[in-house]
Regions:
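Ligand-binding pockets and gating/stacking loops
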Residues: 1-210
Length: 210
């Protein structure tokens, strides 16, 4: 009950406080800054994310939908993906530079990921389906080393052939970069113990600063 009351209090703060409303007001940014992030929804969302973490918000999720092409992917490669990739490149670059400029790059960890990869082979409808065996993730910021590539897939991007890591390993790594206690055990309302990370999960040491 105490935890529920705490979350309700946080919700009231987010809804009613002048401080919270100010964080969501992108008009407080200079036109140059807004232009640097890009005019599309993704760019402005990334800028909002920076404002939120600067204001003390611990976790921010920015969604960028529209990558699911189960059919006619050739057309998407020509007309759909190029503007999305341009917006993604601009937003991530601006966020990376802005965090560093404001001294937040060692306090904020950024994860750019999808929930799965895409099938290496084109399906009968000319598209690509969901593929859980291989995917790529970009991480930068606090607690992480720079310029490190971990793992490798085969030529078709079908399966890892070098240093495979699991989603649990990734989650464990991000928590480690943020300084969380990876051995912590939480308890459900009925007293059942739940580990913060899976017992089999291991941090990706190659990309952690320590």
């Amino acid at each position: 009950e105490a935890a529920r009351d705490r979350f309700l209090s946080q919700a009231r703060f987010m809804s009613l406080s002048p401080e919270a409303r100010e964080l969501f007001d992108l008009n407080r940014e200079t036109p140059e800054t807004r232009k640097r992030y890009g005019p599309k929804l993704l760019g402005q969302s990334a800028l909002l994310a920076r404002r939120l973490v600067e204001g003390g918000v611990r976790t921010v999720l920015v969604r960028f939908k529209g990558w699911d092409h189960h059919e006619s992917i050739a057309r998407a490669m020509t007309y759909g993906f190029p503007p999305k990739l341009e917006a993604l490149d601009q937003a991530v670059t601006a966020l990376h530079e802005d965090l560093a400029r404001r001294g937040l790059d060692e306090r904020v960890t950024v994860v750019l990921a999808s929930e799965f990869g895409r099938t290496p082979r084109i399906n009968p409808r000319g598209g690509r389906d969901h593929w859980a065996r291989a995917s790529s993730v970009l991480l930068f910021g606090g607690g992480l080393r720079r310029g490190v590539v971990v793992g490798k897939t085969d030529a078709n991007g079908e399966a890892p052939i070098e240093r495979p890591v699991s989603p649990a390993d990734l989650f464990c790594t991000v928590l480690g970069a943020l300084g969380a206690d990876l051995e912590q055990v939480l308890h459900t309302p009925d007293g059942r113990p739940v580990r913060t990370v899976n017992e089999s999960a291991k941090p990706i040491r190659e990309i952690l600063q320590s």
